[in-house]
Regions:
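Hydrophobic transmembrane alpha-helices and their helix-loop junctions in integral membrane proteins
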Residues: 1-191
Length: 193
């Protein structure tokens, strides 16, 4: 289509093209590809299963770095290669679905790490709303939220790992009274929330 792989040159060519079948297909492939990595609903199913299986430091990096990196990639590709009007509605719909479904599923969890995983997915929905807004303030809000989420969700997974190590369970029902046993860790968990 553009005869080059240089993003700046591809952008100059594609932004003046009508959205035909090939550009639509490319847009869908980018959204699905980055959507899987950033755990956007309905491509989120791997993340709640990955967090309970991973050690807590890996969960902290997975939630604090990996999914945000994919969101950054999605944002860059969308805004460099496409006109915002071509993707804003689709991204907004995915954002609302991601926020709503992930929050509902988070409330139904008994495993502390699955709860945090669904919380991370919901946060991706909040960030996607900024991407869909298509304004400079929306994008600034996205990256501020990315920074905050990276720090705080990483801290939450590390705190959850300490709690699980001490309590020998991830079941939230069995963690009653853990605040008296681990006050500093519990306070750090409250800061995240």
């Amino acid at each position: 289509m553009a005869g080059t792989v240089n993003f700046a040159q591809v952008s100059m060519v594609l932004k003046h093209q009508p959205l035909g079948i090939w550009l639509s297909l490319a847009l869908i492939i980018f959204i699905v590809g980055f959507g899987v990595k950033s755990a956007i609903v309905p491509m989120h199913t791997w993340l709640p299963d990955a967090h309970p299986e991973a050690p807590s430091p890996i969960s902290a990096m997975l939630s604090g770095i990996l999914i945000e990196t994919a969101l950054y990639g999605l944002t860059r590709v969308l805004y460099i290669l496409f006109e915002p009007s071509t993707f804003q509605m689709a991204i907004a719909v995915l954002a609302v679905l991601t926020m709503c479904l992930a929050n509902i599923l988070a409330l139904l969890q008994q495993d502390i790490k699955r709860l945090l995983a669904y919380s991370s997915i919901a946060q991706m929905g909040y960030m996607l709303i900024g991407v869909a807004a298509g304004t400079s303030y929306g994008i600034m809000g996205v990256f501020l939220h990315v920074f905050n989420h990276s720090l705080l969700k990483g801290m939450a997974f590390l705190a959850a790992g300490s709690i699980v190590h001490e309590a020998k369970t991830r079941d939230i029902e069995n963690l009653k009274g853990i605040g008296r046993l681990m006050p500093v860790t519990s306070i750090l968990s409250l800061i995240h929330i």
